[in-house]
């Protein structure tokens, strides 16, 4: 049993290789991150369960801890943050995204400032939000960056289906987000 006490608590179970048939309960608010370097195998023998608030209340309005499970290693969250939290990386809306390497349709500095205010009591300006964010522990940063990642995947799917949109039939935006968080090569250009 893992007990989170605060909405910003992030409990982690990390294995360099495999996690097999883990039976884990998490009580309270916050997050549980389960990450396997290779395989996360649960089948019908393992479970990851959020039990909710231990006193029966819903202090955050969202109930118990969220659970994030990943296998195959961690994403490159630092590179993802550099791309999606810097307004200098915003693409020219009049040009095709595929022709603008290193650019993205949307950057999330406004959403970052709002999230910091809501989750961490941040009172600074939007311009100072990135420095505040960079000083947070990596597990706290990942909570926000996963939200950005899923927002980009959702937007990419919607753009694909918008026949009147600039990227109709193209999942470029979603593929770009996936490639940034989970690159195919390491920093030296070797395949991962």
Report residues per predicted region.
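Low-complexity, glycine- and small/polar-enriched segments
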Residues: 1-192
């Amino acid at each position: 049993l893992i007990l989170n006490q605060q909405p910003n608590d992030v409990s982690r179970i990390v294995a360099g290789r495999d996690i097999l048939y883990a039976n884990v309960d998490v009580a309270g608010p916050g997050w549980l991150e389960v990450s396997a370097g290779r395989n996360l195998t649960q089948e019908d023998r393992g479970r990851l369960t959020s039990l909710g608030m231990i006193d029966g209340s819903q202090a955050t309005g969202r109930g118990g801890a969220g659970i994030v499970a990943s296998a195959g290693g961690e994403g490159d969250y630092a590179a993802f943050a550099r791309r999606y939290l810097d307004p200098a990386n915003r693409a020219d809306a009049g040009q095709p995204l595929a022709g603008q390497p290193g650019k993205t349709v949307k950057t999330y500095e406004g959403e970052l400032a709002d999230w910091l205010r809501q989750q961490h009591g941040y009172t600074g300006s939007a311009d100072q939000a990135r420095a505040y964010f960079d000083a947070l522990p990596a597990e706290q940063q990942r909570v926000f960056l996963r939200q950005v990642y899923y927002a980009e995947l959702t937007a990419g799917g919607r753009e694909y289906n918008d026949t009147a949109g600039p990227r109709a039939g193209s999942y470029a935006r979603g593929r770009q987000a996936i490639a940034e968080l989970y690159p195919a090569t390491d920093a030296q250009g070797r395949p991962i």
